[in-house]
Regions:
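Active-site helix of classical SDR
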Residues: 122, 158, 166
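Short C-terminal tail/terminal secondary-structure segment
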Residues: 147, 230, 241-255
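Residue(s) in the substrate-gating loop at a strand-loop-helix junction
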Residues: 142
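Short, small/polar-rich loop/turn modules that mediate ligand/substrate recognition or access, typified
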Residues: 88, 174, 179, 240-242
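Substrate-binding pocket helix/loop in short-chain dehydrogenase/reductase
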Residues: 98-99, 106-111, 210
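Active-site loop immediately N-terminal to the catalytic Tyr-X3-Lys motif
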Residues: 100, 147-153, 175-176, 217, ...
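Alpha-helical segment proximal to the catalytic Tyr-Lys
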Residues: 127, 171-175, 238
Length: 255
């Protein structure tokens, strides 16, 4: 895709699943990738794989819920790679249970990771983009935010907030030539989905139910999401902002 060579791009939750696939794809497109993750060893392993394929990446240990750590991670990225061109807010966490069976501690963790962490990243990175009058932001939400999902009430609330937040920033920063778009994954074959299914009485049956519900007949793969994310970051999407794209194999449709 056009315009990604030598661009400095941060990917949060970059060491696994959708994040890992996105980092690899961006490196293949010639971008300089900062892999932000709490699991530094996993991030380093991914960076080594990217470098072995002639890509450029760095591993940064980052807890997005801690603003001081975020600021330090952003500073380190710019010292090593240069000014930040784009941000992918991919880090997330979920707990799968009916709302009345959740606890206040679980609400707090869900909100801190899925909402506050994302706010921290935007607040730390956007000034760089505003100063340069250019930037791309892709936020990873969920189809749970668009249509609801039983057992994910607080997660869906956080991701729904991310949709509105992204559209608002798309308006506020259009004059700064910064685009904001949102990807809503459907059921995707990642560790997050595995965590959801493992909590069921029959995990394999639940996976099969997810698969049957998808018109294209399979679970999403991380590479499916990486392709959509890469498009929104590229010059090919230069006239696209404030949009929400479901990547779900047709599980949810709108128009």
């Amino acid at each position: 895709m056009k315009g990604l060579k030598d661009k400095v791009i941060i990917v949060t939750g970059g060491a696994g699943g959708i994040g890992s696939a996105t980092c690899k794809r961006l490196a293949e497109e010639g971008a300089k990738v900062a892999v932000f993750d709490m699991n530094l060893e996993a991030a380093k392993t991914l960076v080594a794989e990217i470098e072995a394929n002639n890509g450029q990446a760095i591993a940064i240990e980052c807890d997005i819920t801690d603003r001081q750590i975020v600021d330090s991670a952003v500073k380190s990225t710019q010292e090593q790679l240069g000014p930040i061109d784009a941000l992918v807010n991919n880090a997330g966490w979920d707990v799968f249970k009916p709302f009345l069976k959740t606890s206040a501690n679980e609400w707090e963790k869900l909100i801190q990771i899925n909402l506050i962490g994302m706010l921290n990243m935007h607040h730390a990175v956007l000034p760089v983009m505003v100063e340069r009058n250019h930037g791309r932001v892709v936020n990873i939400a969920s189809d749970a935010a668009r249509v609801g999902s039983s057992g994910e009430a607080v997660y869906a609330a956080c991701k729904g907030g991310l949709l509105s937040f992204s559209k608002t920033l798309a308006r506020e920063h259009s004059r700064n030539n910064i685009t904001f778009n949102v990807i809503c994954p459907g059921p995707t074959d990642t560790a997050l989905l595995a965590g959801v299914t493992e909590g069921a009485s029959n995990p394999e049956k639940l996976r099969e139910a997810f698969t049957r519900a998808i018109p294209l007949g399979r679970l999403g793969q991380p590479d499916d999401l990486a392709s959509a994310i890469t498009f929104f970051l590229s010059d090919d999407a230069g006239f696209v902002t404030g949009q929400v794209l479901s990547v779900s194999g047709g599980l949810t449709m709108n128009g």
